[in-house]
Amino acid sequence: MLKKFRLFVFFSIAISNNTLLAEESIITDSSGFQATITRDKWGVPHIYGERDEDAAFGLAFAHANDDIKNIAENMVFYRAQSGLKRGFQGAAADYLIKALDFDSLIKKNYESDLSLEVRKVIEGYAAGLNYWNEVNDKNKYKSIFPVSPKDIVKGFVIQNLLFSGVASEIQRLQEGRTKSNQEISSQSYLLNQHQNILGSNAIAVGPNKTNDGSTRLIINSHQPLEGPVAWYEAHIRSDEGWNMMGGTFPGAPFIFVGFNENIGWGMTVNKPDLTDIYQLEINPQNKDQYLLD
């Protein structure tokens, strides 16, 4: 099974290599990061770096070349500045990010919770974004630069809010779209199960179930084409062991869904019930007091 999967992956990579264009771009910044970026006929970047952090540097540069808009909007979002651009709709997310004080959390735990290896990759990625800004000195997103490694880490933390549904619940509260006690009590979980089956798919098919004896991985994560979690396709490899192709999010230095010569991996998204909202009864005589039962 593993052998056949390897053959399938190697075959896929071989086909991809045959479609690469002859032109290569080698990028090097002042801090010593260096990567080679080669585009195939579909425009997908194939990125090589001697070290893992060099490959991450190249990934960031290529991604910024193709989709700086979504990367820039993510940085605005991560820094709790969405309200400045989106008004009230963005202010809900800003409030939550500031209330949870992610900056202090990351500052306190950056070195203790992340290995040196991971930090180097993140720092290489941030350097790649900043180098793109340096090369494209007339771009219209200058205000988000420089991007720091902690900005990248903050993106991972905040994405948990998106996938858990917390951010959308806070936004719903701020917009005043709350349900009355009568509405809540009259709703049956069994009658509303259709609300809880929205999600995405990842299916592995073993060789005994395929007509050619291959192992296949089918991934449909139902991600949007725009925004903070829009997929971007790339192939990244390094002399330290990286060799992976698949999709990543704007501002992320790793492949989230994809394959290498040994394995394939996917990611799914659903709508789990992870948030509880409590409506307080405010003292009409003093808005700073609420009923404690």
Regions found by a protein language model. Name each.
Residues 1-7:
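Bacterial N-terminal signal peptides that target proteins for export
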Residues 24-228, 239-241, 245-254, 259, ...:
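Substrate-recognition/specificity elements adjacent to catalytic centers across diverse enzyme folds
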Residues 244, 249-293:
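Compact, glycine/acidic-enriched structural inserts
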Residues 20-22:
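Boundary at the C-terminal end of the N-terminal hydrophobic targeting segment
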Residues 8-16:
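Bacterial N-terminal signal peptides
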Residues 234-236:
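A glycine- and small-aliphatic-rich helix-loop capping segment at beta-alpha/alpha-beta transitions
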